[in-house]
């Protein structure tokens, strides 16, 4: 009898704990690329089922996501600009950064390829050709991880992207792809979003394969010492889950048109 009562009390405790977690939503700050690729729609429901924690996604470019997190307006960050994420942690806004996954960026453009970059393995060389021809180029211009990578490539080329047909939009990746398609322009895009939007954009991958185009994603719990109100338990649960075998398996198995667009990368801590 006592044993039954203990077991009942134990089970009740678990249920109450789970209900508390479910009642306190987790605010996940993440990027448009995770949403636009469709991956977020796979990860969030799986996490909610596994940990009984309700998730509310807050979407923005990486730079904006980190600024939102600095204010304590999200509990955990899932983004793709390692250098900025490391600065975020070093400044005391995040607990620690963990690698989650990676893919790559690609330079896409019209099939006619007026600059002749098709097959170019040197991304900086491709940007130099685009600049030399003053070709149409649509930029995110939004301080996102993709925009930061584009800026890195221009700096590496020793060039300033400023000519009449260089358009800085301040828009998300899908809108930029559609604009580039309408204008028959070039742009830099993460491979996953391009795979998801290829048919609508009407563009082609023209340059890829440069190691400098690697696109790494990390996860960071917002520091409760800086913002005591954050959902500390929920954030830690998300970090543990997405870097676990279960989370990594979902990432590895995610496909767009049969193509693997993300690769598990939860190996090291930054």
For the regions a protein language model found, what residue spans apply to each?
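Exported/periplasmic ABC-transporter solute-binding proteins
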Residues: 22-54, 58, 63, 67-73, ...
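N-terminal secretory signal peptides that target proteins for export/translocation
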Residues: 1-6
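Short amphipathic alpha-helical/adjacent loop interface patches that line ligand
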Residues: 9, 44, 104
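Bacterial N-terminal signal peptides
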Residues: 8-20
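Hydrophobic/aromatic-rich structural module bridging two neighboring secondary-structure elements via a short loop
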Residues: 88-96
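Short, glycine-/small- and polar/acidic-enriched structural segments
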Residues: 75-76, 95-108
């Amino acid at each position: 009898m006592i044993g039954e009562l203990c077991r009942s009390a134990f089970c009740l405790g678990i249920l109450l704990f789970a209900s508390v977690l479910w009642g306190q939503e987790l605010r996940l700050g993440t990027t448009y690329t995770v949403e636009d690729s469709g991956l977020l729609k796979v990860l969030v429901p799986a996490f909610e089922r596994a940990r009984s924690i309700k998730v509310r996604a807050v979407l923005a470019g990486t730079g904006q996501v980190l600024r939102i997190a600095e204010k304590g307006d999200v509990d955990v960050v899932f983004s793709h600009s390692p250098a900025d994420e490391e600065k975020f942690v070093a400044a005391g806004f995040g607990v620690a950064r963990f690698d989650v996954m990676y893919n790559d960026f690609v330079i896409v453009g019209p099939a006619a390829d007026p600059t002749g970059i098709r097959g170019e393995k040197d991304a900086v060389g491709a940007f130099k050709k685009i600049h030399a021809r003053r070709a149409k180029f649509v930029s995110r211009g939004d301080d996102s991880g993709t925009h930061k990578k584009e800026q890195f490539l221009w700096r590496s080329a020793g060039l300033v992207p400023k000519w009449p047909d260089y358009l800085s939009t301040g828009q998300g990746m899908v809108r930029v792809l559609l604009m580039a398609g309408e204008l028959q322009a070039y742009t830099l895009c993460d491979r996953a979003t391009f795979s998801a939007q290829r048919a609508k954009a009407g563009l082609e991958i023209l340059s890829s394969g440069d190691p400098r185009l690697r696109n790494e994603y990390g996860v960071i719990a917002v520091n409760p010492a800086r913002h005591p109100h954050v959902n500390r338990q929920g954030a830690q649960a998300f970090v543990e889950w997405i870097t676990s075998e279960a989370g990594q398996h979902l990432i590895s198995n995610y496909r767009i048109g049969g193509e693997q667009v993300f690769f598990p990368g939860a190996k090291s801590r930054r």
